[in-house]
């Protein structure tokens, strides 16, 4: 097996430090808990239902998305490089009686033995935390079956995104620990779609996510100016 090093140790350490609160709906990962129903619905709707399908969740962390997909019948493999988040994910799956295969590995290394294996691959809120996003995108493309779906979510790179996700969410509203995000690692939709296209993933849909701090509610929006998701299909 090849060795792949598309990992930022500082990013891994950052999320390992917060792992103990991963499943606290009022803790540091509250935004992910509130956002997850929108992510799950989008994935399930666009993919034509994930019940009974082989799904790979790249950058699964403590398993919020992985577990929700398994609960609606997907056969889920969760992939991450953080020991503590994976331990939390495995323990919570046992507590809730959900079967999920959690694996410590990079997307690139996992690809070596899993080419064309998955019906659906998800890579949510992960690309902005790795040194080489294009390498992860290519690995995701290699692991999905022809005609299968790969979903990505990340944050746009512009002034508004900086104000809302860093100044607003981290410093003002204290929704996230300071230092969670680096604006320089954010990815414009045009850049993400171009990288996906180079990996032979056709962008079939895109949607934005907006947050109202007054109502504490996330909702879909046509605007991709800040948080957004794209759905891509592997060319046959």
UniProtKB/Swiss-Prot annotation:
UniProt superkingdom: Bacteria
Any one of the GO BP annotations = methylation
Annotated Gene3D superfamilies:
Vaccinia Virus protein VP39 (3.40.50.150)
For binding S-adenosyl-L-methionine, which residues are annotated in this chain's numbering?
A: 39, 59, 80, 124
SUPFAM superfamilies (alphabetical): S-adenosyl-L-methionine-dependent methyltransferases
Does the record carry Methyltransferase as a key word?
A: yes
**Which Pfam families does this entry report, sorted A to Z?**
Methyltransf_23
Instruction: Enumerate the UniProt keywords alphabetically.
Output: Methyltransferase, S-adenosyl-L-methionine, Transferase, Ubiquinone biosynthesis
EC nos: 2.1.1.222, 2.1.1.64
The pathway is: Cofactor biosynthesis; ubiquinone biosynthesis
Q: Which GO terms describe its molecular function?
A: 2-polyprenyl-6-hydroxyphenol methylase activity; 3-demethylubiquinol 3-O-methyltransferase activity; polyprenyldihydroxybenzoate methyltransferase activity
What residues form the membrane-spanning segments? none
Q: Which residues form a coiled coil?
A: none
Q: Which reaction does it catalyse?
A: a 3-demethylubiquinol + S-adenosyl-L-methionine = a ubiquinol + S-adenosyl-L-homocysteine + H(+); a 3-(all-trans-polyprenyl)benzene-1,2-diol + S-adenosyl-L-methionine = a 2-methoxy-6-(all-trans-polyprenyl)phenol + S-adenosyl-L-homocysteine + H(+)
Q: Which HAMAP family match?
A: UbiG (MF_00472)
Family of the protein in this entry: Belongs to the methyltransferase superfamily. UbiG/COQ3 family.
According to its UniProt entry, the function of this protein is described as: O-methyltransferase that catalyzes the 2 O-methylation steps in the ubiquinone biosynthetic pathway.
Protein name from the UniProt record:
Ubiquinone biosynthesis O-methyltransferase
Upper taxonomic lineage: Bacteria, Pseudomonadati, Pseudomonadota, Gammaproteobacteria, Alteromonadales
Q: Which gene encodes it?
A: ubiG
């Amino acid at each position: 097996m090849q060795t792949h090093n598309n990992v930022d140790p500082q990013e891994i350490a950052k999320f390992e430090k917060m792992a103990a609160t991963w499943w606290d709906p009022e803790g540091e990962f509250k935004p992910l808990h509130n956002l997850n129903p929108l992510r799950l619905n989008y994935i399930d709707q666009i993919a034509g239902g994930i019940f009974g399908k082989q799904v790979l969740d790249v950058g699964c962390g403590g398993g919020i998305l992985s577990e929700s997909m398994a609960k609606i019948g997907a056969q889920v493999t969760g992939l991450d490089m953080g020991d503590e988040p994976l331990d939390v994910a495995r323990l919570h799956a046992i507590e809730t009686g959900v079967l999920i295969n959690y694996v410590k590995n990079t997307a690139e290394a996992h690809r070596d033995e899993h080419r064309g294996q998955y019906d659906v691959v998800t890579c949510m809120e992960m690309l902005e935390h790795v040194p080489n996003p294009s390498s992860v995108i290519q690995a995701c493309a290699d692991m999905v079956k022809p005609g299968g779906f790969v979903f990505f979510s990340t944050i746009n790179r512009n002034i508004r995104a900086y104000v809302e996700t860093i100044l607003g969410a981290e410093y003002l509203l204290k929704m996230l620990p300071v230092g969670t995000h680096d604006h320089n690692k954010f990815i414009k939709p045009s850049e993400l779609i171009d990288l996906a296209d180079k990996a032979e993933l056709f962008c079939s849909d895109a949607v934005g996510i907006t947050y109202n701090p007054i109502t504490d509610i996330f909702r879909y929006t046509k605007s991709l100016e800040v948080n957004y998701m794209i759905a891509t299909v592997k060319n046959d």
